[in-house]
Design a protein with these regions (language model features):
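GIY-YIG nuclease catalytic motif and its immediate N-terminal context
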Residues: 1-56, 60-87
Length: 87
């Protein structure tokens, strides 16, 4: 049986802000954000693109990382975006 993966992701919104969340199915969650069925924040601010994602083995790990990323400053999230592009 395949083990479930958990993803922490960062989206860039139309107004330049970032949205951070976690999910078990990244593609499905991105589709729901883009279709306006995602979080209220992304419904109001629009989604431009996925700029960062990380994979975790447990829900707890993903939730801890999500909290860490949400606490990052805007410039620190910009660095995450830059680092993702260089990998």
């Amino acid at each position: 049986m395949k083990s479930k993966s958990y993803y922490v992701y960062v989206l860039r919104c139309e107004d330049g802000s970032f949205y951070t969340g976690y999910t078990t199915c990244l593609e499905k969650r991105l589709d729901s954000h883009r279709a306006g069925r995602g979080a209220r924040y992304t419904q109001q601010h629009g989604v431009v693109r996925l700029v960062h994602s990380e994979t975790f083995a447990t829900r707890g790990e993903a939730m801890r990382r999500e909290r860490q990323v949400k606490r990052l400053s805007h410039s620190e999230k910009e660095k995450l975006q830059s680092r993702q592009g260089n990998e």
